[in-house]
């Protein structure tokens, strides 16, 4: 997207929305807080460096407002995508943090993992701040929902939150960490519903449920089953970025598309909670790295995504999402992307 002016950004947003409509999509999930920052006017977080190249620098217009206007004028929903804990993924991303980035304002809330900086999920004040950010979004913008990515705990290292764990008196570190994450997700859900009960709140966890439970400490099975006043999410959209027949080096095919989707669908789920599936558009032409012989070739057919969508329909899935836009509309393999788009459109716009 071109952030050089509101006019340029609006033109890009209009093209983006038209493109999404052309393949039958009904919702755009737009990243608005990738690094403890904001692609919108916020009193809590600095402007994202993605707008101007410098975190904290005002681009002179409100990108989120433009995206909402362009989406809604075409009948598309728009959800605001938030990374709740991440402040920095590497020394160069973002290249420099604004003075009012939480890493500078509240360093006691922040933990370093490699070159990355993250809010410590065990610190309630940090979680409360994230929830305040969610409330700010739904109170100030006509978004249709809030979407959390899969990044929760940045490491399994017990040293990360050892002091908080010791002070808690809890006996099981993994269970305690899952409680911390669930408390944040539940509070974010409730903040969304407090603003408007018709708004959606969802999470896109990793496609491997074991990783969710034991590495990210996201209790996805409990979230799916919770209902009523205990509801935690309106939907989950696990990232199923593997093809059919996907095989690990061990020979396991658990994560092959045709196996892992039914595994998720078999999980007990509250009637009010939807289950969608994220599909890996970025795999087009690249492959998924599986040990199976067709781990790349099946992603070079021009219809890989459409075949997965057909399979999801036959299994009764609630919906699907594509990651990510550029892979279909700004691809380095335009002929292959064109074919994938045409195959999707034939399914969704017929």
State where each predicted segment sits:
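The substrate-binding groove and active-site-proximal loops of carbohydrate-active enzymes
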Residues: 1-7, 44-61, 113-131, 170-181, ...
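Aromatic- and acidic-residue-enriched segments that line the glycan-binding/catalytic groove
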Residues: 40-53, 86-114, 150-170, 292-297
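Aromatic-lined carbohydrate-recognition surfaces of secreted/lumenal glycan-active proteins
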Residues: 72, 77-89, 147-154, 174-216, ...
């Amino acid at each position: 997207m071109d952030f050089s002016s509101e006019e340029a950004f609006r033109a890009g947003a209009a093209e983006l929305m038209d493109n999404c409509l052309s393949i039958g999509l009904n919702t755009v999930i737009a990243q608005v807080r990738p690094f403890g920052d904001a692609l919108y006017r916020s009193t809590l977080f600095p402007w994202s460096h993605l707008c101007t190249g410098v975190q904290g620098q005002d681009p002179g217009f409100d990108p989120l407002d433009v995206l909402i206007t362009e989406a809604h004028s075409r009948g598309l929903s728009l959800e605001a995508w938030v990374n709740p804990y991440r402040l920095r993924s590497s020394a160069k991303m973002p290249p420099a943090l604004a003075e009012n980035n939480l890493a500078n304002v509240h360093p006691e809330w922040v933990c370093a993992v490699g070159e990355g900086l993250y809010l410590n999920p065990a610190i309630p004040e940090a979680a409360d701040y994230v929830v305040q950010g969610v409330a700010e979004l739904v109170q100030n913008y006509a978004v249709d929902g809030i979407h959390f990515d899969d990044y929760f705990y940045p490491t399994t290292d017990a040293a990360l939150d050892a002091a908080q764990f010791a002070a808690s008196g809890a006996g099981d570190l993994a269970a305690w960490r899952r409680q911390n994450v669930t408390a944040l997700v539940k509070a974010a859900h409730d903040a969304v519903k407090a603003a408007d009960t018709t708004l959606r709140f969802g999470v896109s966890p990793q496609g491997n449920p074991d990783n969710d439970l034991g590495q990210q400490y996201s209790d996805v099975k409990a979230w799916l089953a919770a209902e009523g006043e205990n509801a935690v999410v309106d939907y989950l959209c696990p990232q199923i970025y593997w093809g059919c027949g996907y095989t690990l080096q061990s020979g396991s095919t658990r994560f092959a598309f045709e196996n892992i989707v039914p595994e998720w669908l078999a999980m007990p789920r509250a009637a009010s909670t939807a289950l969608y599936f994220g599909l890996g558009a970025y795999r087009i032409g690249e492959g998924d790295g599986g040990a199976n012989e067709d781990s790349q070739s099946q992603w070079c057919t021009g219809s890989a995504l459409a075949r997965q969508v057909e399979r999801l329909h036959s299994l009764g899935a609630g919906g699907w999402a594509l990651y990510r836009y550029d892979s279909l509309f700004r691809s380095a393999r335009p002929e292959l992307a064109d074919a994938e788009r045409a195959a999707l459109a034939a399914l969704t716009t017929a």
